[in-house]
Amino acid sequence: MTEEISTPLNYRRYQDGDHTWSDFKEDIFVGDASDKCPTYVHRTPPCQGSCPSGEDIRGYLQIVRGMERPPEDMAWQEYAFFRATDANPFPSMMGRVCPAPCEDGCNRNDVEDFVGINAVEQFIGDTAYQNGYRFAEPPTLTGKRIAVVGGGPAGLSAAYQLRRKGHASTIFEIQDQLGGMFRYGIPGYRTPRDVLDAEIERILALGDIEVRTGVRVGRDVLIATLDRDFDAVLWAIGAQQGHGLPVPGWSDTPNCVSGVRFLEAFNGGRLQVTASKVICVGGGDTSVDVVSVARRLGKIKNIREKDRAERVIGGYAAHDSAMAAVREGAEVTLTALFDREAMTATETEVDDALTEGVRVLNGVMPIGLIRNGDGRAVGLQLARCIIDEKGIPIPQEGTEFEVEADLIVSAIGQGGDLTGLEELANDKHLIEADAFYRVPGRDGHFVAGDIVRPHLLTTAIGQAAVAAQSIDEFFANEIRSRRPRVDVHHFNLLNKLNEHQLAPTPYDHTQSWGTDSGQFAVHNYEDRAAQEIIPSQRLFLGHFDYESRNQRQDRIPTGDEVLGDFDERRLNLSEQQAVAEAKRCMSCGMCFECDNCVIFCPQDAVFRVKKDRSTTGRYVDTDYDRCIGCHICADVCPTGYIDMGLGK
């Protein structure tokens, strides 16, 4: 993604050089008419299809913009919070740190620039925090209790979703506090601890979620004990074991450490300063966090042997906070195998690191350590490299060079620590999962998060929701052969009608048959959201004017200012900005009440539903006695909600 708008500012259906006629069979005409009539079809927007958590993004944007109205006794801000947290109980956290694959998928990229979904999500979460919003009262307990092993994003999300289904849980967490990667893997200036604590407390406030911290399952509690005392087990232990560099001598060199341990020592408050010259090998978000923290921590002159950074990171010591008063700037270098454009780290995070004084070397790979007589690393040997067709880096002969270092950090990947749980491990030291996040061959065992496959936080949250649903179905002895093709949280028209006391009435067989006025069914509506994602080609993009994105302000210190700067960097949108940004949403696959179909219908066949019967998704209807099948309504529908197909 880029902050710069590089696409043209106008939309053209046909481009210069187009010379192929459209298929005339798409529209079957007799004069100005056809035997096709409009029907209203709900599809999933690509933002939601691109969101690993499966959030109803279009839904909460519709609420923020004022299009979808809340119940009479609820503020729209709280209604948006409920919609956003149906899939993800951490809107404040994810609004800050999610790399937002939803924005890459946004159809508005084909107009001018994506909708700032991530920024609006942070606004929803921070508003909920400021106003003290709570989750809805959970249902009565079912009597089932699940052991959730791991209190990070996946484990907490699973406990949340399970409680909403009526199931109690006990969370076993090896650390002293809950939060996992939110707390121990990401610096506090990106995930403010007061907001994190509030979002965790909100989950626990649902009740019947027991927490046992400082407990290692496999050592303090055995798997057999969990099988005996609980109705199901969910493994959400994360991937807290960092991989070392594949160079000789790495494991027995004291000042060579993993990025996971570096960040854990910093976030735990033990690491107050780092080394004079720090190199981090990576290219992903963890490596960027390492170098950004290193620039903030700085160094101190003449550090004592027992206070060296690697001893603190290894857990053998802890720095006195007084060290912070005498620290100086450190030289920090980030190396990556790939070119800048191919780095997996979020582009803005890399930009910020450069602003803060980090040196970034792209297209290089480590080939060896340089050690002194004491066995400490004093530098890293590197070479330019190319990536072959199998994704393996190949060093280029004659391009070798050295970079001095007092601390070398590896952030090239993470794996699971399955000590005491070896019977669960696959050949990658992770836990196997099927499509339902069940552990194959272990009845009643489920898994979610990085221990399945290290990926994004939003992925862990989405997997936890699926696992919770699978646990619920396990208790009900329901067996499904497959998940939905588009496996996300969808708008549900029937739920919306129920919310506004407009649910279909019982069928009356004495009513005149053949009429569309009966209230026993939802007429002329098809829900394909679980099967289809709507592409931009199905929209009438010419409807949308160019509008600049409402961007958050990022407070990024320069290289001269970064030392000791641990204040939050990402500032929230104002309410006015959030509403304006939500209005840029094109509502792909769902009516957004623009009136185009009503205005342009030459037969006055399309009409607005009466206000006392109108809801989201039921704003317009069609009088088929008047409709001639001219398809104009479908052509001018900006959101692709109208299909010409009824009667075929």
Language model regions located:
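Ferredoxin-type iron-sulfur electron-transfer modules and their immediate structural context
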Residues: 1-145, 193, 235-252, 260, ...
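Beta1-alpha1 glycine-rich phosphate/pyrophosphate-binding loop at the start
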Residues: 22-24, 48, 55-72, 110, ...
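Beta1/beta-strand and adjacent pyrophosphate-binding region of the FAD-binding site
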Residues: 141-154, 274-284
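Generic beta-strand/beta-sheet core signal
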Residues: 149, 172-174, 214, 235-237, ...
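Short acidic loop-to-helix transition motifs that present clustered carboxylates
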Residues: 216-220, 262-265, 340, 367
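FAD-site-proximal beta/loop scaffold in flavoenzymes
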Residues: 254-278, 284, 296, 306, ...
